[in-house]
Amino acid sequence: MSQESNDLFCEATYLNFTAMHGIQSIITRVRALADATLSDELIPPLSYFIEASNHENPVELEARDLPFAVYLISGNAGSGKSTCIQTLSEILDCIITGTTKVASQNIYCKLSNSYTSPHINTIFQEFGFKGNHVQANLGKWQYVCSTSPPTMKELQKKDIVYYWEVLSDITKSMLKVLDSETGPGKFDVIRTLEDLLGKPRGNLSWMTFGIHGSLPSFTRSNIIIIDEAGLLGKYLLTAIVYCWWLTNAVYRTPQYKRGLKPVLICVGSPTQTSSLESTFEHSKLRCNVRISENILTYIICNQTLRSYLDLSNNWAIFINNKRCTEPEFGDLLKTLEYGLPITEEHARMADNFVVPEAFINNPANLPGWTRLYSSHKEVSTYMSRLHDYLKTSGNNKFVVFTLPAYTFISLENFERYRTAANQPHITLEKWLNVNAGRLSNWSQSRDQDATQTRCEIRSQQGLAISCSDITYVLNSQVAVTTRLRKWVFGFCGTFENFLSVLKDDSFIKTHGEGSIEYAYRFLSHLLFNGMINFYNYLQQRSLSEHAVKTAYNKLATLTNTILFPQRQLSAGDGENFNDVIVPTDLCHFEGKGIEDVDIQQRHENVDDVIFSALDDQMIDLLYCNYEFGHAETSSEIYTQFSMLKTMFMGRYSIMVELFGRNFSTSRFDSYVDNVSSRGCEIFINNMRGGMLSLALQTDSYTLMGYTFARVNAFADEPIRRKIQPHVAEVLGELNMPTIVLKDQHGFMAAVNSNINDFVESVDDHELKMAVTADYGISSKLAMTIARSQGLSLERVAICFAHSGLKLSSVYVAMSRVTSSKYLRMNINPLRETHSRDDNNISEHLLAALRDPKVHIVY
């Protein structure tokens, strides 16, 4: 480490090892598990999977041990589990996944903050789960273990039989690779090359993934990280292991040849909301949602599994909440997390958060706070009450408006469904009503305030079109329910906000993955169009006349210095705006008032009339002397961006020096073209110059309205989604608006419509029943406690149910905030009758904390 420093930069180096000591032993243990090899007789042969694919009844399958290992990482919210994943990904070659899209994107955001990271898939995508498996009839077959306690082979067979409808389809699809010429031979070619070059086996296997980019991730590594694993049902543990062995047996990978086994690193909290499983009974037209044992509880509580996995030596517990800065509140959350005894002191602290239930349910109170409820019905009721209140309150900021959402039902497949499901008398309206939660996002369908559906039959296209109007609130906080394409076309915030965007590379990181040139070109466009905001600010009459004159002089001098660096102005020249030459051939400005000029004689252009009324000082020389061209090469693009960025930062410094915070917090808007609004509708002449990006569930958005402006990048959506031509034709006729969202940084974007296929499975029939088209957003003003898990919310007001209280739900709800100052509750759940639904998991956790073999990370 250098001890010297120059005048510009300090050369001292600081290394952060604060968390490394606790994580180092985890890395060592995971590496040991991953490097352990099996004898040949323990490796599941390819013939096992070929034979399994021929069985119609999975109960007849041979009970076989599918070897695997698990390292468990548990802990409460904000304790450092994600940081541990980041360290593991940096040091080990591993496959990182999440249980849901939100979990995957959360961990992606964590990784991409430090370095460039590929997108993180869900564990379902990695093991081969497809869209047509969503409607699979799980549990169609059942296997009863013959011994008590059951052996590991029996536990695995029980899970495989339960999940066989999905695993059977995945197995048959994977075995088709054997029939292709290059499928399983991809690694054989590399092995031949290793033999020719005299290299050890596996030395060049990494080249395979560079040559064949479409290889399944399971062929690359045997270390699989699953974030938020507590949301997975227990049978998925074996399903993942089964698919790993299947994939590697088919491709004959180096790790399969070496006898390596899959190592699952399960990360999460076993004491939060339960894993849920849903099935649809066509005979009763009813969707059944039931609680199932999650993977973490299964691993911790099942004695056979604990012994097989040697859990005590393969378990790390993170026990400190680093998000919460209040020790007393953090202690309360820890008590709820681990099921520790609740004291009177804890109860008295919770008393401080209690307010009347009517106070929380009144939309006039706690504006901007997120309401959490136990049921979707309560959420829907509050949203209706909120919308009614806003309609009559006269609030100009939070305005209520409605947008149409559509469902296109295939009449032919609907008739086939009625026959297959033995429902000859079911109507379209009834079918739509009972399947609302399956057609779109479950929470979205239950929570939103929507009108009664209206149906229209179009016999020529063979379609029934269902339409309902959904109510939204302008300027409210929303989240997208799935990953959607968006077209970023502007910025709306403050000067200070935009400066932070320029100083921080986060925008370039998140939007420059495809081509960084697009991101720089877009920012240059906003910089050029938004530079006039500095001069607009100076038009305020409340500003000091002397400060305004000084600002005009300094802005003009700065602009000329940057645009014409070869023109060396003396210090005296820089003091007077009159010394700066405005090119008259570009501007034609006379500098006289309109009243002094004969308009008909002196002006041929209306713009000249307008500008002649301005004082010379009001003219931004940038627009007179610089033509914003379309830079082509990378160097030209960055040079243009660098020049405009330098000018913006220079102007910002001048204005802050003269006007302070009053300027920096003033509004700064810039768009790729002229933008105006009327009510909730936004008008923009042309979207050209914007850039394509993705709207993620992990981002926070503000609903700014809607627009009918055409976005060319979205025109191929029906083709990309493989929507039937007649549906695409009708969708085009309806001309659905595009919603406009502002992200947490201030960037404005038009978000593509959320278009999805709905495929119904009835016995052995797969029917393409419907196509849905909505906006893919849900409000953050109110949601269920279960939906809030994993979200960080600034201000929360909770309405607990008065009966059936579960401490796991109480913990999830209360731990959404980082400060107890922004927490309100209708009751004190610690003083009410409550229960635990965690299968005595707390006792196991407390025992683990006392176990010297379990690794504790503070």
UniProtKB/Swiss-Prot annotation:
GO molecular function: ATP binding; helicase activity; hydrolase activity
Native source organism of the sequence: Gallid herpesvirus 2 (strain Chicken/Md5/ATCC VR-987) (GaHV-2)
GO process terms (BP): DNA replication
Record text on subunit structure and interactions: Associates with the primase and the primase-associated factor to form the helicase-primase complex.
InterPro entries in alphabetical order: DNA_helicase_dom (IPR003840), HSV_HELI (IPR034711), P-loop_NTPase (IPR027417)
Lineage per the UniProt record: Viruses, Duplodnaviria, Heunggongvirae, Peploviricota, Herviviricetes
Family: Belongs to the herpesviridae helicase family.
Protein name, entry field: DNA replication helicase
Keywords: ATP-binding, DNA replication, Helicase, Host nucleus, Hydrolase, Nucleotide-binding
Binding site for ATP: G75, N76, A77, G78, S79, G80, K81, S82
GO cellular component: host cell nucleus
Known function: Component of the helicase/primase complex. Unwinds the DNA at the replication forks and generates single-stranded DNA for both leading and lagging strand synthesis. The primase synthesizes short RNA primers on the lagging strand that the polymerase elongates using dNTPs. Possesses helicase-like motifs and therefore may act as the helicase subunit of the complex.
